[in-house]
């Protein structure tokens, strides 16, 4: 089965139609109106009605809170794949809840119309359906949490809560991100989150930081500098903080070496 999603629309391509049996088939889960949905079809009808049955359902409804409800306008289009051909559409408004998680049409389309070679609904063994879901009302919890607002700061998508911190970094350390090489926004976001987190850690008082915190900050610093960030001030801050804890770090390292030696001895004994 092929699937494609864009905004409120979801395209479902049912492949190898002729080899399908009389049972049901499901599409992948998709999102519309911050809710999850799934299509259910009986492509060959049943033993009584010679129609293509098509439904939309709420997947994993048992995980939603008691009393949930949602109302949606649903449109199904059986796509005519011949250029200029007339597609067939059905639409309705439904309430979905704990008792009624599935709605649709038992007579979406005559099987004889689909199976006819000159009608354009079955091409190369594929039937194409477009579902459009407009969520009108939701009672209870949404499936998809709302993502926090992000604002563009010098080419970086920054959460609204961190705009002030990011502006401060660019004002104090101009050009610190001018040579970053990843162009993908997801990668840039990941690197930026690491820089902001590391900045917050190193702004704490030295006595508030453990050796583990410093080790993580060092690893993070190496990670982001390899991506092109120029973070001289963070490197300086890490060195200053680390030197004030040098004796403690040496003691921790000594303990680790003793533990490693003990583990090596245990392995030798077990072998």
From Swiss-Prot:
Keywords of this entry: Coiled coil
SUPFAM superfamilies according to UniProt: TRAF domain-like
Keyword Coiled coil recorded: yes
Annotated ranges, domain MATH: 7-133
Coiled-coil boundaries: 230-271
Stored InterPro entries: MATH-CC_domain_protein (IPR050804), MATH/TRAF_dom (IPR002083), TRAF-like (IPR008974)
Gene3D superfamilies per UniProt: Apoptosis, Tumor Necrosis Factor Receptor Associated Protein 2, Chain A (2.60.210.10)
Protein name: MATH domain and coiled-coil domain-containing protein At3g27040
Upper lineage: Eukaryota, Viridiplantae, Streptophyta, Embryophyta, Tracheophyta
